[in-house]
Amino acid sequence: AQQENARALMALVAAFGHMQTKDPADPAVQAQVQKLQAFITEHYYTCTKEILHSLGQMYGAGGEFTANINAAGGPGAAEFARKAIERYCCG
């Protein structure tokens, strides 16, 4: 079940790669952020906006998270996810 959850989580984050033509504030993009937050809360821990914002920062920071997300979602997916999450959490 853990591997299944990890794959599902990566698929949710990687989906931001296919949304890069949209604005991070677009309702469809923001709905994807909500799905991500709900999934983390359901399967891992209570994902507050503060925690989600920190995750978004890690996704776009250029390390292993960024590389894995971009490998799954395409170039720029991690940075776009960071922008979308920041918009969701900070307005």
Model-derived regions, located:
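Amphipathic alpha-helical "stalk" segments
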Residues: 1-91
